[in-house]
């Protein structure tokens, strides 16, 4: 009988950090599920590149703020591949993406529905099958903005990221009996073309002045923390901070 390949589900993996983490886990031998909500072409492109490099990847659409959709996603993965072994809650709402017609309340609900509710729903479904998948991993992707918010517009984003730390500790305690570890990855600013395009070169350089190392991190530098969390068997309920000193620089 062919040995079952372990499955890693990365939410919000159609671009940026999520796509990078998908590539890294595929490189470790996981069958990677590239989750996305809207960008079909981008997600399919990420999965295709992983397959071209010899990895195993499949793009799957699911709005993780939709409970029935999340239940259906995990049930499908259980039926097709024997379940999920590694869950990476990476999906978020970009704090700079607020539409002009969104009221404060609408924006709050929008950000938390994906960044917090979505992570909770995915953790909850992972837990439903936990007894059958011992030695699993959950990694919740937070941000240094959880402890160092920078502007009024980011209140909802920072709040959602801080709440993930509590979610991590709660599930770490609940799932330890199944040898499942749950940790938080908290990156600082990441240098991506999309980010620099949005804030401009001047804005990017100004942000870098508030990082002790004087630069933003790369997606691969952040993904190093994910690899560690996935490979380590004895760390749970903890936070891996990778921010170049952004949390304490002036």
Predicted regions span which residues?
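Amphipathic alpha-helical dimer-interface segment in Rossmann-like NAD(P)H-dependent oxidoreductases
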Residues: 114-133, 172-173, 177, 227
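Active-site loop of short-chain dehydrogenase/reductase
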Residues: 5-6, 55-56, 82-84, 130-144, ...
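A glycine/serine/threonine-rich, flexible loop-to-helix segment
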Residues: 153-155, 173, 177, 184-211, ...
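Conserved glycine-rich cofactor-binding loop
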Residues: 14-15
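Catalytic loop of short-chain dehydrogenase/reductase
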Residues: 92-94, 139-163, 168-177, 189-190
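Conserved mid-core segment of classical short-chain dehydrogenase/reductases
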Residues: 71, 92-109, 128, 152-156, ...
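C-terminal substrate-recognition "lid" of short-chain dehydrogenase/reductases
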Residues: 215-242, 247
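Catalytic Tyr-X3-Lys loop
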Residues: 101-121, 139, 164, 208, ...
